[in-house]
């Protein structure tokens, strides 16, 4: 809303609203739709169905995809969406535009993408028999980022196969080719940022039975700056940042500046290959972590643009508000909006 008021928003963009929707959120969607914005709420469950099924504006609905993939965060039970049978039993919508689903994150096999797309297309064609406005398939996110600099399969080839599948299945059913939405945010924005640290101390590892020979201590914290390192064991490509590529290499572990023993990074194969360096204040070593633009310090506690909660202090029978819950304006300012 603020971006619209400031005339900094492209009104030709389509906004897809995923996730749970409070009454306040639903009212905002309605307000923006009445102002002419192309806002499409994705119906995630029965409560939202009551609010949007007969809307005169475009809506989408989520399929609870039974085709599973080998990927991160692939859950056997998904709390979002409706099964195929539930969708096909629904009375027709007034303006159903989008069928949405997702199968996981950072999926590993192209065949999983195609299998889920084919299943979703069959549901799409069945739904379209009663909902003639349906024209878009949203295959969600999950395209993996080659964090380790190993490109497992080219994205253009995957897209070619998806387009070929959409074309062939559509023509087989005598239906116009659907529009395609991909929510590959991580894949798009991760390469847009690198994170550089200065080595502020080194320490030899004298214990036997480990491959690493040195600790390198950085002037930052993985738990603050690259939180996926600690939270999900994310691996990164790491290199010296200040032209020390001719130096002899050593096997290192990298430690953050916090006092937490979990604030470490031990590399893809158990070590990080870095220039063999002993701390020298007059000859600093800087190292760079690549592809850090998705979900790290850029989002931190604002994943999915959620605001930080109200903070209160309860002491001796008194309750004091230490910090109010962040407003949408506060969150926007964090991103320079």
PLM ranges: what are they?
Residues 26-27, 52-53, 148-149, 191-192, ...:
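Short glycine-/acidic-enriched loop or helix-start segments at secondary-structure transitions
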Residues 109-115, 146-158, 189-201, 268-269:
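Short glycine/threonine-rich loop-to-helix capping motif typified by GTGT followed
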Residues 47, 82-85, 111, 115-118, ...:
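Conserved active-site and cofactor/substrate-binding residues in soluble primary-metabolism enzymes
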Residues 171, 175-337:
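Charged (often Lys/Glu-rich) extended helix/loop segments that serve as interaction or gating elements
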Residues 18, 44, 62, 102, ...:
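Generic beta-strand/beta-sheet core signal
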Residues 1-136, 143-145, 165:
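Active-site-proximal beta-alpha core segment in soluble small-molecule metabolic enzymes
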Residues 131-146, 287-298:
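C-terminal extensions
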Residues 54-57, 125, 131-135, 157-160, ...:
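Acidic/histidine-enriched ion/cofactor-binding microenvironments in catalytic or ligand-binding pockets
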């Amino acid at each position: 809303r603020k971006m619209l008021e400031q005339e900094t928003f492209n009104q030709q963009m389509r906004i897809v609203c995923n996730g749970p929707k409070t009454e306040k959120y639903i009212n905002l969607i309605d307000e923006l739709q009445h102002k002419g914005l192309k806002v499409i709420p994705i119906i995630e469950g029965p409560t939202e169905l009551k609010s949007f099924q007969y809307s005169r504006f475009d809506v989408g609905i989520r399929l609870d995809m039974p085709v599973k993939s080998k990927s991160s965060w692939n859950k056997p039970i998904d709390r979002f969406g409706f099964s195929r049978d539930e969708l096909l039993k629904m009375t027709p919508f007034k303006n159903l535009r989008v069928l949405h689903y997702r199968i996981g994150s950072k999926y590993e096999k192209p065949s999983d993408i195609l299998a889920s797309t084919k299943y979703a297309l069959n549901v799409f064609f069945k739904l379209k028999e009663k909902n003639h406005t349906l024209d878009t398939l949203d295959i969600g996110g999950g395209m993996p980022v080659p964090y380790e600099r190993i490109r497992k399969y080219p994205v253009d080839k995957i897209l070619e196969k998806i387009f070929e599948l959409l074309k062939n299945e559509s023509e087989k059913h005598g239906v116009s080719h659907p529009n395609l939405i991909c929510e590959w945010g991580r894949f798009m924005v991760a390469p847009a940022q690198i994170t550089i640290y200065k080595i502020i101390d080194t320490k030899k590892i004298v214990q036997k039975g480990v491959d690493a020979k040195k600790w390198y201590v950085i002037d930052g914290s993985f738990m603050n700056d690259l939180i996926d390192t600690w939270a999900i064991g994310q691996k990164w490509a790491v290199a010296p940042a200040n032209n020390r590529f001719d130096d002899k290499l050593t096997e290192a572990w990298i430690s953050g500046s916090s006092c937490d023993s979990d604030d470490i990074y031990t590399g893809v194969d158990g070590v990080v290959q870095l220039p063999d360096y002993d701390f020298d204040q007059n000859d600093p070593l800087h190292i760079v972590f690549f592809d850090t633009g998705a979900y790290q310090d850029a989002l931190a506690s604002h994943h999915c643009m959620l605001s930080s909660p109200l903070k209160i202090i309860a002491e001796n029978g008194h309750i004091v508000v230490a910090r109010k819950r962040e407003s949408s304006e506060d969150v926007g300012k964090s991103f320079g909006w």
